[in-house]
Amino acid sequence: MSISNQSGLDILREVDDEGQENSFLRKTTRKIQQFFKSDPGYQSRKAEYNSPAKATGDVNINVTSQDWLSKLDRNLSIENLTGKSLGIVVVSGRNKGLIKNPFLGGLVDIVMRRQDKLYLKSVEQVSSEYSPMQEQVYEFKVDMPLVQKRLGAFLKKNRVDGLSLSMHFSTGNYSLPVLIRHVLLYDYYTDDMKDSLWRAMIIYVSRQVTSNKYTKFHLWCVQKRIGNIRMYLVRPGDVYSFQGQTSWAAICNKSYMCNIQLEQSPEVSVKSSLPKYSNEPIFQSKTISQEEVGWLLFMLSIGNHARAFPIQNYLANTVMETVLPVELRCPFLSRSVDCEIFQKNTKRRVMEKWRQEFKKDLNVCEELEFKNVKKSGYMQPLFDLTMPLGCFDSLETKEMFYLRHNIAGFQADLTPYPMRI
């Protein structure tokens, strides 16, 4: 064997031995990494895919302070815009009047579109006056096909876990933090997972109907899947419109405020989207308030701008402060581990970490299912999984439910159905 051939064999042996620290392959890899890292733009390009939020300071995102808000702009009339009456009755004269901005101090977010890009500005304020203590501007930027393909492959590989979590969503065995996390990932999931999340949201809203935080009209809207799914986590009573500016809306309470630029004005929504639903029987019942119509127009008008609304900021500063902490790494996600799936090159160990987090959510749901089984005292047949726990899956009243199942002794109220698994 010649000397040159012997040298070539030595190199091949070194390439094959990847376990050696000074192997030819490892040396070459380190050199390539050092070359790319020496590029000043490497870190910025790498960070671009760390999460949907790309921090930027080059865009001016400001909105005039709104001291007065309204539930529905007084100049916006369904009858005037459509040329016909929908039979809507105004329940309270307060709905058309101006309301003092309830925000007293805390976190303020602004969602705005500039040059076909969505931006979110987060500001810490000590009062409703514009006195920012700390602020940050993010651009919402996602390689949608990449993330959808990645999560599709994940659910295909982990089909059993995916189906199990979907079943728990569909039957009401979930905690609110688990629901919030996966609702924020809704746009990147497969159609089957999206369908289960809508079923979970129907359960969530129906439970809120029984506690008088939502109405039957809101339940009808979520059943029709109107608008962006995450906006159903916002209490309808916290949604306002700007005074004299129908292209802007506000979501606010005493400790949180978000000013959102709508994707299309309510006037456009009335003419383009509302006619699809105006012939529904619920619109002829004459029980819908003007405030509910205003909320519907908000849901139809916000469009894809809802993707940039940080729902976890709203919840963390209102009812979920002790349950859902705000993670500063990305304002569009609820957990840091979710940022990893947005990287351009996701390593196998990263998806394994995400799988473990997915498994934790599944374990939480299974524990809730076990507790509900013990509480109810009996198992629901496998073929009868259409009725979620403690809620209405349709506009069927409790009386109708008892009559359909031939159960005597019903009461005329809106308490939940008997728990069944």
UniProtKB/Swiss-Prot annotation:
Read off the Pfam families from this record. UPF0300
* Keyword Nuclease tagged: no
Sorted alphabetically, the keyword list is: Cytoplasm
This entry carries the following GO cellular component terms, namely: cytoplasm
Compartmental location:
Cytoplasm
Q: Which family does it belong to?
A: Belongs to the UPF0300 family.
This chain belongs to which protein, by name? UPF0300 protein C737.04
Specify the species. Schizosaccharomyces pombe (strain 972 / ATCC 24843) (Fission yeast)
